[in-house]
């Protein structure tokens, strides 16, 4: 089943998220499962300083969330800004932080590299047949990037290749049909 409930408001207005966090926490208490993950919509602008993100992370922790996901839907987060962002948020919260970015601007893999080095706990990837473009970086590439480092996943590249080979015909069929 699904245990991580990603809770999102496109304006990052935390009061809109409180009831969903509460409901997830009730489920966790009653059924022994459920993880309230508050997703923040990453964006640019004068209001979105490192202090804004760090303070918001602390407020999310105080809401009772289990983790935070930074959702960079437009691929705006660049590598060194990701490093600064993760460090600032980690200084203000003990919650695990997940990063979800898109390859739209072509820097997502490098952004993940710097975010991991800065202490992000989880990165979202996609198997190579579905990766890149407006999707996430390829799982296989990120696994190889971290091989032999303190961030080594231990994933088997041969198994990942089998998984990619399995899904490639489905991707090709979708492309053939204009999806």
Where are these regions (language model features)?
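Catalytic cores and adjacent flexible loops of soluble metabolic enzymes
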Residues: 1-179
